[in-house]
């Protein structure tokens, strides 16, 4: 995804790489014998912000979420409304199902986490 963002590969090349990673991940999970597997979120740009892909009403100066391991995730800020999903989790599930032989679970970001996109509103001069 970084190579695509830097213009080093085409969208078609990125999609091919994503699909290869997805097929490999699902095949490896299948080998574990687990009755339910996951797609490993291989094709999501971010576990927290995948629903925002393609939206044009976001600004870059949103909340930063720190993690215990020292990593951070910078959320975008909703610059204008209304909010809507750019991509739904079912899109990732349907793609993964084309490769899976076992039931899949799909990670979905909570609506409460997405509420962090909304700018803080000033009340009573604060």
Regions found by a protein language model. Give the residues of each.
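Domain-level signal for soluble alpha/beta catalytic cores
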Residues: 1-126
């Amino acid at each position: 995804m970084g190579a695509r963002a830097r213009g080093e590969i085409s969208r078609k090349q990125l999609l091919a790489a994503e699909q290869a990673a997805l097929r490999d991940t699902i095949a490896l999970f299948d080998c574990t014998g687990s009755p339910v597997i996951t797609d490993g979120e291989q094709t999501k740009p971010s576990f927290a912000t995948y629903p925002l892909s393609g939206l044009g009403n976001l600004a870059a100066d949103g909340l930063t979420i720190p993690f215990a391991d020292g990593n951070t995730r910078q959320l975008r800020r909703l610059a204008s409304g209304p909010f809507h999903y750019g991509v739904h989790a079912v899109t990732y599930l349907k793609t993964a199902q084309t490769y899976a032989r076992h039931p899949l679970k799909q990670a979905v970001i909570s609506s409460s986490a997405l509420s962090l996109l909304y700018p803080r509103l000033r009340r009573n001069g604060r």
